[in-house]
From Swiss-Prot, chain A:
This is the non-catalytic component of the active enzyme, which catalyzes the hydrolysis of ATP coupled with the exchange of Na(+) and K(+) ions across the plasma membrane. The exact function of the beta-3 subunit is not known. Residues 1-35 are cytoplasmic. It comes from Oryctolagus cuniculus (Rabbit). The chain crosses the membrane at residues 36-56. This is Sodium/potassium-transporting ATPase subunit beta-3. GO terms for cellular component: apical plasma membrane; basolateral plasma membrane; melanosome; sodium:potassium-exchanging ATPase complex. GO terms for molecular function: ATPase activator activity. It is a single-pass type II membrane protein. The sodium/potassium-transporting ATPase is composed of a catalytic alpha subunit, an auxiliary non-catalytic beta subunit and an additional regulatory subunit. Interacts with catalytic alpha subunit ATP12A. Residues 57-279 are extracellular. Keywords: Cell membrane, Disulfide bond, Glycoprotein, Ion transport, Membrane, Potassium, Potassium transport, Signal-anchor, Sodium, Sodium transport, Sodium/potassium transport, Transmembrane, Transmembrane helix, Transport.
Amino acid sequence: MTKKEKKSFNQSLAEWKRFIYNPTSGEFLGRTAKSWGLILLFYLVFYGFLAALFTFTMWVMLQTLNDEVPKYRDQIPSPGLMVFPKPLSALEYTFSASDPSSYRGYIEDLRKFLKPYTLEEQKNLTVCPDGILSEQKGPVYVACQFPIFLLQACSGMSDPDFGYSQGSPCVLVKMNRIIGLKPEGTPRIECIPKDENVASISTYPNNGIIDLKYFPYYGKKLHVGYLQPLVAAQVIFSANSTKKEVTVECKIDGSPNLKNQDDRDKFLGRVAFKIIARA
Amino acid sequence: MRQRKLEIYSVEHHAATDIKKKEGRDGKKDNDLELKRNQQKEELKKELDLDDHKLSNKELETKYGTDIIRGLSSTRAAELLAQNGPNALTPPKQTPEIIKFLKQMVGGFSILLWVGAVLCWIAFGIQYVSNPSASLDSVYLGTVLAVVVILTGIFAYYQEAKSTNIMASFCKMIPQQAVVIRDSEKKVIPAEQLVVGDIVEIKGGDQIPADIRLLSAQGCKVDNSSLTGESEPQSRSSEFTHENPLETKNITFYSTTCLEASTSPVGTATGMVINTGDRTIIGRIASLASGVGNEKTPIAIEIEHFVHIVAGVAVSVGILFFIIAVCMKYHVLDAIIFLIAIIVANVPEGLLATVTVALSLTAKRMAKKNCLVKNLEAVETLGSTSIICSDKTGTLTQNRMTVAHLWFDNQIFVADTSEDNLNQGFDQSSGTWTSLSKIIALCNRAEFKPGQESVPIMKRVVVGDASETALLKFSEVILGDVMEIRKRNHKVVEIPFNSTNKFQLSIHQTEDPNDKRFLLVMKGAPERILEKCSTIMINGKEQPLDKSMAQAFHTAYMELGGLGERVLGFCHFYLPADEFPETYSFDSESMNFPTSNLCFVGLLSMIDPPRSTVPDAVTKCRSAGIKVIMVTGDHPITAKAIAKSVGIISANSETVEDIAKRCNIAVEQVNKRDAKAAVVTGMELKDMSPEQLDELLANYPEIVFARTSPQQKLIIVEGCQRQDAVVAVTGDGVNDSPALKKADIGVAMGITGSDAAKNAADMILLDDNFSSIVTGVEEGRLIFDNLKKTIAYTLTKNIAELCPFLIYIILGLPLPIGTITLLFIDLGTDIIPSIALAYEKAESDIMNRKPRHKKKDRLVNQQLAVYSYLHIGLMQALGAFLVYFTVYAQQGFRPTSLFHLRIAWDSDHLNDLEDNYGQEWTSYQRQYLEWTGYTAFFVGIMVQQIADLIIRKTRKNSIFKQGLFRNKVIWVGIASQIIVALLLSYGLGSITALNFTMLKAQYWFVAVPHAILIWVYDEMRKLFIRLYPGSWWDKNMYY
């Protein structure tokens, strides 16, 4: 039996060799040079045609799009909440007030992020009346000023360390931009620590108000210079608490059409993050 | 081992030589098997020294410890029964159900999917260890894969079991009774309880309950056709006449039938049981059959080949991209998940179940046409059959003697030999016929069993031997009520046929009341009858029998004999009234009446005629490129005559012997190439080397093997298989069963077939009609073509399923389609359409092309794979991507922004991912969009699979020629695709685990232009194939 197998192995080896190059018929991998030429030419033409066709259909499809507004916005009916700066992994801020290198990254991110919000940057923007939606007809859409001082202690103006050096870090909470979203009521962001004995939260602007004048958003292309309204949450650990670790939950409140509860989407209208302040 | 002889299997005395040869060949093949066989043979050999036929009654009594008059004692019988087991054949070993089930669980692609499932679980395990909150996705996937394997396995098992069950009910044997003498008493016991040494009584019509040494019998005849293929009854008596136990007259064999035992008054033959159960000749042949390995069916080989191709592609692409993924710095776990996804995308999970359904649909269709298929895979085998080795008796012939020719008035008349026999159109006006018909009716001892008036004549049961039965039925058809004629012509004396006289005689009063003469009628061997005659009747008048008349008689006799027919001569004589007055007392012992100088009336010849449908079926097989070979145990002359009459040897072809005779030269001088036909006897065959047999099989298109033993049938089948032919064997007798088993497809006869034959066969012709085989061939070829279409259809979408993963890995697009979604295509939308292709009608006349070459015309060939994967598959992938890009673009993510977005897109912590319009998306919102993308991609594939389904209806003809609406099931399939997709999207869109969303109505139509393009492209392909057959295009594009 082994003998037979050996033989067939040798045979198959010879067959393979002949398959790779057959000297009698000049076939290489089962085809002659001419045949290979033909088949390659065929595929060149065929795939060239398919590529052209695909490009064309894609082009046709792109023609159906509008540069300013996406055709459908039904998949994002309600905005998510997100915090800033973005920790490296998960939503956990770990820092030590006594070690500036532990929070330098956060501060730099915040500064960079807040750059468009500085007063010089916004001077071309409109001062809009508070409390009402600034609906516009175009063709030119103006953006409303978001004076950075609204963020008070977290504005970086009085405290360039955004509270990190004092052990009371600032985290910015922002609502995702959605084109055409018109919040109803008086939307505000409410942040609550999980354990009130450990820390308390101050929100700026006061009460975490998000002014309606920043809505609706008209899209990146039309709404040049648009500034997203921000809410800053400053975590102030209780002096008597030894534990310097708290989970903070922020959610949109006060607006009936902005959802803050969804079983599947943990970030729809709410966000939870954790602050760990090491000694 | 070389010396071992198994002559018992052989009809010929010396057939053992070929058995030796066979053993020698087999021995080289497989050492293990040889060892096993050796033991088996050793055991057989001991019992093969059957010498009971040589022993005297006394010796037998001592040998078996029994008493011929009193029989065995019940206690002794019970002892022997316990010792030797019941007198029944051990049924062939059944594979345990659980093994069958497990085979389904691991066969085909299942192993691959099991590996995938296990990898999934392992991947989750590793993830879980590092992060207990890891997502359960891979657990779901693994479970789903396992469930898919188990479900398809259960399904395939159920299908198999269903077709096997039909067989089980079919093969139940009727319990048999035997009359046995035990404790000096006659008892009726089940034949199963017979033991060696039992004294049994046999009546005419009984099945012989075991191998029996006859002790006393008169005029006993047995039908050995199921054992040797001889259609003529063999007479049996208590004398030892031959060395060979098969030839000697004093042994009868298990499962043969006793036709007639003893003269009147109804008596019985007695005999002693010498072998029971598996130790009988039949039992040994049956065990020989079960020793023959079961070959894999051609379709099983094809499916295996196909599974290898697809699994090869799946695994190599999977591993290639695993390596690429690792090189691209993907996490190894992620790379494993990709690997699984690629395998899942490549494996057509539903296909094997679909193939099973398609085969069982064909099996059902064939069962309706009286072809019962035992093994589902055998459905296709007939389609690829290139050689049919057919038994003669009972398969090609009706297995009953029938009057074929008559000779009277110096003229040969042809009688109708068709199954109903009603159309006897020869000239019946001559006075000679009147006399002849009277002799036929009167000089005959056969009788119809009473109470059969309503049964058609040819179907009535007759008591009597085959020739007499034929004559009785013949005269009943022509003359009407023969019993009545016999009553009117009262029989006064008779001498039954015996082998020394070779004639049968009876004397009757005539029905004419004015004619007081007695009529003496006689029939027998023609030369004997002629000797006794001095006159001959021509046109109703007696003439002296001169030399020229005698010459004419001989010519006619030779001619009829040359047709392989059994010829009988008939004569009569009116006894003069003065010498033999009414009161004359005839005596059969002293024969006090003249038996010479009679008047010769005519000859009549009989044959077991071919079934009327056979010639047509043989012609059809021929035009389908199938070689029909006759293999029979019967005599060469008869075999050749039947072969000629059914067209196995066509009218204008000659054998070497024919040419020699025609040209008047010696057989050796004939150029063998001139002969198209060959008649080979078992004796010649046993002297042939395998090479000579190969040469014979290769060079002669028309071959008849005669006087072959069961062993030789096997050798012939093996010889055919060496020619790379797919061999079908048809047969009904026990002697056929080894060959039936060895053949690629064994076809047994349902009505006349023995249980052994049915057990060994893969297919059963319920109506015993050879022409059903043609139906089988047609259906088999059709299903092969249609399976090609089904597979092509199913493979196509694999590319569309695979590309998303490749592009996801390489270009980092958000995943276009999920693994579970893929399974919904493979096992949801595509199932019914791929079954629907099994209903497709043939494109052209499939019975006019050659059978496929086992090694060249594969089910899945390169062209099919290339065309499905690289042409249609790729077009489908593009179409599906178009839908996918459309969905993303219209929601805000333009195609260009999607590239290399994967890491951000898949990050759970990134909940403000910005799209091209400045909007921000949370992780879940993106996820939901991704599912919408899955659904869109799914719908894209589904829509194009509709086009794929339509184009796969034909491989060469235009769809419009085939008819869009002829196969309604295709439309059921299309409807099912759409309905399943709608249900998934709109009905189950809210179930998260399934990853489907409600897709906007317009997205269902995005891929339609691509679908139309696929159709147009394929029509173009077919057009060029039709326009330029044999061209480069044809070679590369026709699958």
